[in-house]
UniProtKB/Swiss-Prot annotation:
Its EC number is 5.3.1.24. This is N-(5'-phosphoribosyl)anthranilate isomerase. InterPro entries: Aldolase_TIM, PRAI_dom, RibuloseP-bd_barrel, TrpF_fam. It is an enzyme of class 5 (isomerase). GO terms for molecular function: phosphoribosylanthranilate isomerase activity. Pathway: Amino-acid biosynthesis; L-tryptophan biosynthesis; L-tryptophan from chorismate: step 3/5. It catalyses: N-(5-phospho-beta-D-ribosyl)anthranilate = 1-(2-carboxyphenylamino)-1-deoxy-D-ribulose 5-phosphate. It comes from Caulobacter vibrioides (strain ATCC 19089 / CIP 103742 / CB 15) (Caulobacter crescentus). SUPFAM superfamilies: Ribulose-phoshate binding barrel (SSF51366). GO terms for biological process: L-tryptophan biosynthetic process. NCBIfam families: PRK01222.1-1 (NF002295).
């Protein structure tokens, strides 16, 4: 698939109903989490069943991981067969290159952000990652690298130029995503907890509302 330069990613999907809501709302990316500490964690075999109805229908599927080992990469590619793998840990540029080569698909590299110096880290992944993602730095002691509802100063991304399409993530919801897009100038947005009624419980109505808000912001 070609590199998407605009749109929204709904992350942490786990039911047929929420996958349908994301697809019907024209989400560009559907994210499935493979991290056992997350309330959104699903087995690769479950994700494979969830993506089957939308496979090849113009949406990119994303396997979201944290410092994945080769065994997990192999299992994901043998079952879910995602279009992209997202890495949300302490992966180095060389490790991201290894993952991309092993999987044979592009990689989204996520960065935890609280200052402009954190945004600067992206330069080291030039030519390595297919997409970049800037997420809020989790509070100290959190076991989750993302999906916490925390947000950072969107203005840190304003006017920045990157060699790859980039996502804004962290604390987005149907009510603030329009402002976030306007302030940051970011072409891609990612949401997880902002479309939930409880930890890991995605709400189809909130997914639809979020995607509608993204469309309005880009009109």
């Amino acid at each position: 698939m070609s590199i998407s330069a605009h749109g929204a990613k709904i992350c942490g999907l786990s039911t047929p109903e929420t996958v349908k809501a994301a697809f019907d709302g024209a989400a560009a990316f559907l994210g499935f989490v493979f991290f056992d500490k997350s309330p959104r964690n699903v087995a690769p075999e479950v994700a494979a069943r969830l993506v089957e109805p939308v496979r090849g229908r113009g949406v990119q599927t994303v396997a979201v991981t944290v410092d994945p080992d080769d065994a997990l990469i192999d299992r994901l590619m043998a079952t879910m067969r995602p279009d992209l793998i997202q890495v949300h840990g302490k992966e180095t540029p060389s490790r991201v290159r290894e993952i991309a080569a092993r999987a044979g698909v592009g990689v989204i590299k996520a960065f935890s952000v609280s200052s402009s110096a954190d945004v600067d880290q992206a330069a080291a992944f030039d030519g390595v990652a297919q997409h970049l993602m800037f997420d809020a730095r989790p509070v100290e002691g959190s076991v989750l690298p993302g999906g916490t509802g925390a947000r950072f100063d969107w203005g840190l991304l304003a006017g920045r130029r990157f060699s790859r399409p980039h996502f804004l993530a962290g604390g987005l919801d149907p009510w603030n995503v329009g402002e976030a897009i306007k302030t940051s100038g970011t072409p891609l947005v990612d949401v997880s907890s902002g479309v939930e009624r409880g930890p890991g419980l995605k709400d189809p109505a909130l997914i639809s509302a979020f995607l509608d808000a993204v469309k309005r912001a880009k009109d």
